[in-house]
């Protein structure tokens, strides 16, 4: 008898997300990935493929699959998927309350922080799947 922890779920894979410079994200579903339900919580999830090297010090490399929970308001310091105009980025997110701005921080010292007046948070990264 299968238990809830044995259950496999499919989540949509939306293609590449920039881990570097701004990049447009193709909104078409590229496919689905199957993961054990026990790997994630109760929420709405999707997956993106990391593109670039700005998050390498957080363990996210070019080509990794990032599992994202839809969440419009992450805590400071969370790795988030952020839409800025027609681009989507994966960065560490900080809300600068005093300045009423947002800071997007890369986890690679060769990239500068990005400071924005406004942005749209799509979700927070919760898992990274890698090929070995």
Language-model-derived ranges and their functions:
Residues 79-81, 90-95:
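Short beta-strand-centered aromatic/proline hotspots
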């Amino acid at each position: 008898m299968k238990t809830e922890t044995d259950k496999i779920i499919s989540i949509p894979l939306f293609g590449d997300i920039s881990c570097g410079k701004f990049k447009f994200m193709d909104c078409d579903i590229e496919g689905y990935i199957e993961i054990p339900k026990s790997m994630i919580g109760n929420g709405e999830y999707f997956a993106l493929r990391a593109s670039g090297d700005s998050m390498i010090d957080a363990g996210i490399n070019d080509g990794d699959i990032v599992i994202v929970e839809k969440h419009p308001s992450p805590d400071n310091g969370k790795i988030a998927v952020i839409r800025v105009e027609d681009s989507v980025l994966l960065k560490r997110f900080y809300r600068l309350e005093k300045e009423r701005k947002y800071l997007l921080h890369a986890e690679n010292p060769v990239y500068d922080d990005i400071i924005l007046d406004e942005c749209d948070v799509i979700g927070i990264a919760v898992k990274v799947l890698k090929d070995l």
